[in-house]
Amino acid sequence: GVLVNYTGIACPNLIDQYDQSDLPLTESACGGIFMLPREVYEKVGGFDDDLFLYHEDHDLSWRIRMMGWKLMVLPDSVCYHHYNFNKGVLKFYQSEKNRLHILLKNFECKTLCLIAPAIALVEFSQIVHAFFHGWFLLKLKSYMEIASQAIKISRKRRKIQAARKVADKEIVSLYQSTISVAGLKNPLVDYFLNPILK
């Protein structure tokens, strides 16, 4: 599974860790390896075509949980995935655009209002990060893309919220309160961002 912060930032902090036999429920399946019944996939509408790369697995998992199904980790299963944490140009743009897309689409209104300050803080941090890496225009492009899809996102949102069986309170309890990525140490994240997000 994949650990995710409630602002939508993926937190792959179990990479290169020893296997555990008592892994808890997870809020998001990893798109690299997961299995689910076709009936479940079709019931939740499958993958969102607007999420070409990144967070498409998070979105599908979220909608599965909203319909009352659980996501389990099977520690005895083995899959080899040559993963390389690389925050390149394409990944940054697609990840940022899709992260905001699914937050706006899947959270209840009251949840969005409650976490709006945290989302604003993370957005500010991502803008600063983008500026120093030469990706500022890509970050702006992600906002423009979200704005251009506002009506479409709103339609999807109404459909999803009308069909949901599980409230955010249960789902959000599985999200991470901090941002943590294995092998990545950033003093600004560790000593500024995470204490506030908690």
Per-segment meaning from a language model:
Residues 66-172, 182:
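Active-site-adjacent helix/loop segment of glycosyltransferases
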Residues 1-52, 58, 67:
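Acidic/His-rich active-site region of diverse nucleotide-sugar glycosyltransferases
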